[in-house]
Design a protein with these regions (language model features):
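Glycine-rich phosphate-binding loops of nucleotide-dependent enzymes
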Residues: 1-256
């Protein structure tokens, strides 16, 4: 199976600190791939490189087998890679539909849209409602403001936005970080729904039980390198943590 998104030999230095030290990466079609590692392992730098927020000093990124060069997140979005950030990046004062189309607003047809710049709110609300139903997110009124939603529902809006516009990959950065058990479960169900729609997901998480619950494969970072790719069925959580900490050797049971 050919990877949807891959990287070879990524290097990123910040002065004397090497954040990425020749990292390889493969995301396969239709999978949830978790990326784990201690602080300083290079998780954030890797994800920033894949999402266009950081330009690596060396190495290559390929999308569907073709080399890509992202200079900013907009380049990655245009290529079909959407990122749902840890800080949610939703606008609390705006309604759900406006949040889903943030930066991609649909204008009314004709003079009303081109001259007066009026938004086609009905179309945006209808499409938002369809996206939310697709992902089985139980919010009915697209006109309610995001600040009235629970943490899990807000995360749902952010995930729906990513899934609505991604053509190739959805990257989720700590999507359950600030949520309780019930809301975390809801977001994990959402992540599975995104995969069911055929979009592969990259999941960055510190929460190892969550990773083992939802991921098909786990990419383990340590000291700026990829030291393992494992399937949750092949190793237990304790071994994954030991590999992450350098107390156990790396292994690649999940690379086929």
């Amino acid at each position: 199976v050919n990877p949807v998104l891959e990287a070879h030999g990524l290097v990123k230095r910040y002065g004397h600190v090497t954040a990425l030290n020749g990292v390889d990466f493969e995301l396969l079609p239709g999978e949830i791939l978790a990326v784990i590692g201690d602080n300083g392992a290079g998780k954030s730098s890797l994800i920033k490189a894949l999402s266009g927020a950081l330009i690596p000093d060396e190495g290559q990124i390929l999308l569907d087998g073709k080399p890509v060069h992202f200079h900013n997140p907009a380049d990655a979005r245009r290529a079909g890679i959407e990122t749902v950030y840890q800080d949610l990046a939703v606008a609390p004062a705006l309604d759900i539909a406006a949040n889903l189309f943030l930066g991609r607003e649909v204008r009314r047809k004709g003079v009303l849209g081109t001259v007066f710049r009026l938004l086609d709110t009905k179309r945006m609300e209808a499409e938002s409602s369809a996206h939310m139903q697709d992902l089985k997110i139980g919010i009915n009124a697209m006109s309610q403001s995001v600040e009235t939603l629970s943490g899990g529902q807000r995360q749902g809006v952010a995930v729906a936005r990513g899934a609505a516009f991604a053509r190739h990959v959805v990257i989720m950065d700590e999507p359950t970080a600030a949520l309780g058990v019930k809301e975390s479960g809801m977001v994990l169900d959402l992540i599975r729904e995104v995969r069911e729609r055929g979009l592969p997901v990259i999941l960055i998480s510190h929460d190892i039980p969550t990773v083992f619950d939802v991921a098909d494969r786990v990419h383990i970072q340590r000291l700026g390198r990829r030291v393992a790719v494992v399937r949750p069925g092949d190793v237990d959580m304790a071994e994954a943590v030991a590999i992450m900490a350098g107390a156990a050797p790396g292994k690649f049971t999940g690379s086929e």
